[in-house]
Amino acid sequence: MKIFSILLVALIICSISICTEAFGLIDVKCFASSECWIACKKVTGSVQGKCQNNQCRCY
């Protein structure tokens, strides 16, 4: 049972790291979140994005 718990925790940690690296900052300069929507649609297939530190972040 201990091994199962350890494997489960390891799987969760790996899944979190993979998911957080899947999307993120893209090389598009912006001043408003609406400028990121089209760029994020092209990269991720979703318009969910925002302008963060003058760079688009897609979700």
Swiss-Prot record:
Site feature Aromatic residue of the functional dyad, where: 59
GO MF annotations in UniProt: ion channel inhibitor activity; potassium channel regulator activity; toxin activity
Chief location: secreted
Pfam families reported in the protein's UniProt record: Toxin_2
A GO-annotated cellular component: extracellular region
Cysteine pairs bridged by disulfides in the record: 30-51, 36-56, 40-58
Annotated signal sequence range: 1-22
Transmembrane segments: none
Taxonomic superkingdom: Eukaryota
Annotated positions for site Basic residue of the functional dyad: 50
Subcellular location: Secreted
Alphabetized UniProt keyword annotations: Calcium-activated potassium channel impairing toxin, Disulfide bond, Ion channel impairing toxin, Neurotoxin, Potassium channel impairing toxin, Secreted, Signal, Toxin
Record's keyword annotation contains Secreted: yes
Entries under PROSITE patterns matching the protein: SCORP_SHORT_TOXIN
Tissue expression profile of the protein: Expressed by the venom gland.
Domain-level remarks: Has the structural arrangement of an alpha-helix connected to antiparallel beta-sheets by disulfide bonds (CS-alpha/beta).
Purpose of the protein: Blocks calcium-activated potassium channels.
Family per similarity comment: Belongs to the short scorpion toxin superfamily. Potassium channel inhibitor family. Alpha-KTx 16 subfamily.
Protein name according to UniProt: Potassium channel toxin alpha-KTx 16.3
